[in-house]
Amino acid sequence: MTATVRRSRLSSEREAELYQAVIELVREVGYEAMTMDAVAARSRSSKATLYRQWQGKPQLVAAAMRHNRPVKTLDVDTGSLRGDLHRLADEVGDAAEHDTSFMGAIGHAVSSNPDLAAALQEMLIDPERAKLDAMVRRAVDRGEIAADAAAVEFFAHMVLGAVIARKFLEGKFADGEYLSRYVDAVVLPALGVV
């Protein structure tokens, strides 16, 4: 008879320490140069612990990003789409400058690492997109926008696109004031909200 191997569960405090080590290392050396050995050393843990909890580096980094994300889309529900989007703009704007070196490293790595892209898609992007879709469904249910509004399909792209594009096009962060103006000038009119 063989003994069942139990996967030990890390405390939330210990998990947060590991995630912080991951974020710091990606900021310092980039995703490609970050190793599980370096994470183990920085977090004073063993590689075995890391691999027991996460399949590998892509999953660990995606989990760290999910844990440390500054904007919690799920928490945004003011009772109106305009209110939701302005609240989201403020939160995203406050966080935009916070992690540019980290996000730059991840953005570069995603383009050449399909495992990282898949882990981020599963653990971060899909859940956040579902929350944005729920925001639109609430607005449809309240009668704020038509269910068949053509721009509904592109809602997530409009909301997230401004954050990414402003840095590349203007060299500036998309702060809350900029994003609020963008919401009023682009997103709401595209959805048919006056």
Task: Please annotate each region the language model reported.
Residues 118, 122, 126, 140-185:
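Hydrophobic/aromatic-rich alpha-helical bundle segments in the mid-to-C-terminal region
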Residues 1-29, 33-44, 48, 59:
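Basic, helix-initiating cap at the start of DNA-binding domains
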Residues 97, 105, 115-142:
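Amphipathic alpha-helical packing segments from all-alpha helical-bundle domains
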Residues 1-5, 87, 94, 130, ...:
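C-terminal peripheral helix-coil segments that are non-catalytic and often amphipathic
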Residues 72-102:
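Hydrophobic alpha-helical connector segments
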